[in-house]
Amino acid sequence: MKHIRNFSIIAHIDHGKSTLSDRLIQTCGGLSDREMQAQVLDSMDLERERGITIKAQSVTLNYQAQDGNTYQLNFIDTPGHVDFSYEVSRSLAACEGALLVVDAGQGVEAQTLANCYTAMEMDLEVVPVLNKIDLPAAEPERVAEEIEDIVGIDAVDAVRCSAKTGLGVDLVLEEIVARIPAPEGDPDAPLQALIIDSWFDSYLGVVSLVRIKNGSLKKNDKIKVMSTGQVWGVDRIGIFTPKQVDTMGLGCGEVGWVVCGIKDIHGAPVGDTLTQAKNGAEKALAGFKKVKPQVYAGLFPISSDDYESFRDALDKLSLNDASLFFEPESSTALGFGFRCGFLGMLHMEIIQERLEREYDLDLITTAPTVVYEIELTDGTTIHIDSPAQMPVITSIKEMREPIAECHILLPQEYMGNVITLCIEKRGVQTNMVYHGKQVALTYEIPMAEVVLDFFDRLKSTSRGYASLDYGFKRFETSDMVRLDIMINGERVDALAIITHKENAQYRGRQVVEKMRELIPRQMFDIAIQAAIGNQIIARSTVKALRKDVTAKCYGGDVSRKKKLLNKQKEGKKRMKSLGRVDVPQEAFLAILHVGKD
């Protein structure tokens, strides 16, 4: 056991985590040169296309250290994006240490800080690594000072390496062996294994990634899942070298995968503990704190026949992604679907794209909303996550919206633009600290504003230099209203949005204009209105197409033309009272982008 090292790699987006993992695998000979490819751990097509890590991946390597011993390194490559921070905290729970990778050109950024604090809270040993020192813009001395100044860990003798060229990677490995503690645990105690991650394989059933905290696990053991009490036999067990390799068992302190032939998707939830069926452990390990979704949106299959396969797809995805929440919902405009909860807009995009790709579904999304707290006049408090659940205005005593605490790190020269942006988003500044050339701003901004497009706007006003980390702080009383969109006098429930009263007029006008461009012209006029309660605040009309009925009259009396025109008018009136307007798919998507430009 004293030759095992478990660690994660944490860093901000694009600071070179995945490339460093590649080098570690290559140096330790985990894969032959032929099988090696860039970002070998980003196994999803989506990850490779966007160049980001979404799922944490684990690898077991054997490293021949300079002191002559062979060490077993179990490491987990983690995502850097704020939407996937729960992946990071789960990975850290399985480790004793973390490599904090910092780009020697960019310096410390918000996610670096957030992930590093998470690691310190869990009492992990944090080892700083300065990456990308082969770049002409690299300033390792300045960045080392920055790490000490902002993060507060000793970084003067931090390892300098370049993951791309492979320079200094052996030093990183030596640092890991020297500084990260060996796992603690009792090999002879009853088994306690923490499930870090699970995914569904159509041949094997549920595959779980586990970290053995106490005891050991062998093939053909009978094990019990502690939360459900079900007993299973271990069919296959092994490690990733990044390839799945079968072994006979896992010892204390090791990380590996287990297949027990569990077919029920909820059979082995993430954060659960496995133990032996006979004389097992008394109590379960402390799991992970449940993450609450921040953004909710309705997802509906375009053809209603896909509803069942959509439910299956969500089930399988939620096994792999513990933070996805969903419940059935129905809409008069869109039929049956699910109300899903996500951690942020990127998470929502990724999930939607994974559903469409991996499960071949065509989906419509409704406008995303955050969770609001409403105090009713009878004194009860309710939480709503969709405009449809909002009670009538007369029964609402006060409405509270979620406020997010945002930590923004940016170079001084962009401070003006960023502050303007925060004020526009109804933000309140609570703190500001200078660290060398960097400024750390703390703002309290309504979650609804942060979640929609704050991240994109922040990146564009600061030319990509500002970085953001945010978390839910509290609910605060606010003047929110529900904006309904009416087409020909009928409310379309899927187009309703909850917005702040100050922005309601503007949002309403914009949505109405947008809809006018997107709804195809019919044989009759279509009125598109935006309303708050019974008060109409914006309106626009899609003009009717008309046939030239008087074309066949040549000369002749004006009353003949009048008769034909009146007859046409009557017909249009009748069509208008009976005609239904189909709202095209693009119109629902347009709602998402209102207020961006």
Curated annotation (Swiss-Prot):
Its EC number is 3.6.5.n1. Keywords: Cell inner membrane, Cell membrane, GTP-binding, Hydrolase, Membrane, Nucleotide-binding, Protein biosynthesis. GO terms for biological process: positive regulation of translation. Residues 2-184 form the tr-type G domain. This is Elongation factor 4. It holds the Pfam family GTP_EFTU_D2. It is found in: Cell inner membrane. Its main location: membrane. It catalyses: GTP + H2O = GDP + phosphate + H(+). Required for accurate and efficient protein synthesis under certain stress conditions. May act as a fidelity factor of the translation reaction, by catalyzing a one-codon backward translocation of tRNAs on improperly translocated ribosomes. Back-translocation proceeds from a post-translocation (POST) complex to a pre-translocation (PRE) complex, thus giving elongation factor G a second chance to translocate the tRNAs correctly. Binds to ribosomes in a GTP-dependent manner. It comes from the Bacteria. The gene is lepA. One of its GO terms (molecular function) is GTP binding. It is a peripheral membrane protein. InterPro entries: EF-4 (IPR006297), EFG_III/V (IPR035647), EFG_V-like (IPR000640), EFTu-like_2 (IPR004161), G_TR_CS (IPR031157), LepA_C_sf (IPR038363), LepA_CTD (IPR013842), LepA_IV (IPR035654). PANTHER family: TRANSLATION FACTOR GUF1 HOMOLOG, CHLOROPLASTIC (PTHR43512:SF4), TRANSLATION FACTOR GUF1-RELATED (PTHR43512). The keyword Cytoplasm does not apply. Belongs to the TRAFAC class translation factor GTPase superfamily. Classic translation factor GTPase family. LepA subfamily. One of its GO terms (cellular component) is plasma membrane. GTP binds at residues 14-19, 131-134.
